[in-house]
From Swiss-Prot:
It is found in: Nucleus. The lineage of its organism: Eukaryota, Fungi, Dikarya, Ascomycota, Saccharomycotina. The keyword Transcription applies. This is Mediator of RNA polymerase II transcription subunit 10. GO terms for cellular component: core mediator complex; mediator complex. InterPro entries: Mediator_Med10. It holds the Pfam family Med10.
Length: 151
């Protein structure tokens, strides 16, 4: 993605965020209205108007997200994040847990690589001690494996 695409994506995301915040706020207002519903014709008409406005806002947000020129079409959101949101959890928790899992995996892989290098060097040393005539071949293998014998 070049800088122009990133700027367009940022603009599209900001616009979608504003629209979504407006929809959420309207639904909160609608929930309060339903809770305090007095049952009059005027209040019924107000709720219907608010509901129609929300449906129209959702329709516009959907059109904006599916616009061929919109960068939002290229956004992929992991299903796990959506599940977190549906469960009422903060999606930042998913991000933090994901990063921690990757960090643990990287540490594990790094430890395995270190252990294998130590095993390689130990084997090379023992082979060199037992079979001195194989030292050049062992050194060649270590060099081809892009390793070094650190003591």
């Amino acid at each position: 993605m070049d800088q122009q695409d990133l700027n367009k994506l940022q603009t599209n995301l900001s616009d979608a965020e504003i629209r979504l915040a407006s929809i959420i706020e309207s639904f909160i207002e609608l929930g309060v209205s339903v809770y305090d519903f007095p049952g009059t014709q005027e209040s019924t008409q107000g709720m219907v108007t608010n509901l129609k406005r929300n449906v129209e806002r959702i329709k516009l947000l959907n059109q904006h997200a599916n616009d061929p020129d919109s960068q939002l079409r290229n956004m992929n959101i992991p299903l796990e994040v959506l599940q977190y949101i549906e469960d009422g959890r903060n999606p930042d928790v998913y991000t933090r847990e994901f990063v921690e899992a990757i960090r643990r995996s990287n540490q594990y892989q790094r430890a395995k690589m270190h252990a294998l290098k130590k095993l390689r060097d130990s084997l090379a040393e023992k082979i060199g001690e037992e079979f001195p005539d194989l030292v050049p071949q062992v050194q060649g293998i270590i060099e081809r494996a892009n390793g070094s014998r650190d003591k």
